[in-house]
Amino acid sequence: TDSEGNSYTVQVPYNYYILNVKLTSKPISSVASELLTPEQLEMYQVYRQTLGNKPLIFGGGSPDMSNSEDLTGVVFVNGTRPGNQAVVDIAKSQVGNVGGQPFWSWYGFNSRVEWCACFVSWCYGQMGLSEPRFASCQSQGIPWFQSHGQWGGRDYANIAPGDAIFFDWDLDGRADHVGLVVGTDGSRVYTVEGNSGDACKIKSYSLTYECIKGYGLMNW
């Protein structure tokens, strides 16, 4: 608009530029392995166990807030594998522990992580075993048992005290939780689990429970 109130149009020259950008996509697992320290990478592998918008933000563990179960009156059925009652007794002695200390610090973490696998590894460590030792169910625990020929699927019928039991809560094919087998009465499997609602508890499940992913079979 000019001084007399008349509108007019003016063409103003300008320069413009086109920016061509090439983007490279990398999976987060690749970035993690490149940028994280060994301790951070191990923690990341633990966190990967639970994915998506779930009650457990990070993986490993059970959201079960129910009380520990009573084994009074349970009649266990012995299979052909001997198992190890001593490691079961060690695990049972920790029932009532809340928060997972000393299990995650024994493993080497400086702060709390989801600690079900640390608990199982700690129990084996108290027996003088250096292996199996794992903080992640899916990426460390199961591969160890499979690579040593010590893996049994959900329908494996000869579990023994001291075996590891792995769970897949959301049935996505990845193990989310692990505990120690106390024994079976022929229809149910009884366990001691760390990080079950952030506590050590005795639990039991039908042997056909669909969330049982399989068993790590210990050779004593």
Task: Give residue ranges: language-model regions.
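Generic short beta-strand segments
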Residues: 1, 97, 166-168
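Surface-exposed intrinsically disordered loops and tails
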Residues: 2-9, 147-150
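Non-catalytic propeptide/linker segments at domain boundaries
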Residues: 5-78
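Short beta-strand segments
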Residues: 8-10, 177, 200
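N-terminal capping segments
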Residues: 54-129
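...with weaker cross-activation on analogous glycine-rich loops/strands in unrelated enzymes
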Residues: 130-198
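Active-site signature of cysteine proteases
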Residues: 187-220
